[in-house]
A protein has these predicted regions:
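Conserved Walker B
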Residues: 2, 8-10
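Canonical AAA+ ATPase core
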Residues: 10-17, 25-71, 76, 88-89, ...
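C-terminal helical "lid" of AAA+/P-loop NTPase domains
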Residues: 117-139
Length: 162
């Protein structure tokens, strides 16, 4: 018994006949039946791919009667996540950087509504910005404590290009 969480579950069905994806799906279905009283199986992934995945095996959709759709984060929520991630690492944005992040989120979400509004996007930008900040500070002769803690607009611009 227990709980099994499978993220990006649709990837099990992508490989075709020569990999073990189909066998994995068949095993999951079999175990769901054999342990229906003490096994919770949670499948996660992007909505469109999950719909496709549930059609790849007869009866798979009916075995998952409860489906929960989590909407993408809003620009304000992405901004809040970015601020939180930075503060957890003991960094902060200056005001220009904060505005640039908001502009960047708007641009990314405008280009591709699908898959953009998630925390992974924010984490990647934050991590790249911190690396850009470090590369910028290495070039300076004098570095203040504030310099060490502050992410600038230019750090974000360079991070978003890589």
């Amino acid at each position: 018994g227990g709980v099994l969480f499978v993220d990006e579950a649709y990837s099990l069905a992508r490989g075709g006949e020569k990999d073990f994806g189909k066998e994995s799906i068949d095993t999951l279905v079999k175990n769901m039946e054999e342990h229906k009283d003490n096994l919770i199986l949670i499948l996660a992934g992007y909505k469109q791919e999950m719909c496709w995945f549930l059609e790849t095996n007869p009866g798979l959709r009916s075995r998952f009667p409860i489906q929960v759709d989590f909407p993408d984060y809003t620009i304000a929520e992405l901004q809040e996540i970015a601020e939180l991630m930075l503060s957890q690492r003991q960094y902060c944005f200056n005001e220009e950087a904060r505005l640039e992040m908001e502009s960047l989120f708007l641009e990314i979400l405008h280009k591709s509504r699908e898959y953009s509004g998630n925390a992974r996007l924010v984490r990647n930008i934050i991590e790249k910005s911190i690396r850009q900040q470090a590369m910028r500070l290495v070039e300076q002769d004098q570095v203040s404590r504030n310099d060490l803690l502050t992410i600038t607009r230019n750090d974000i611009l360079l991070a978003s290009q890589n």
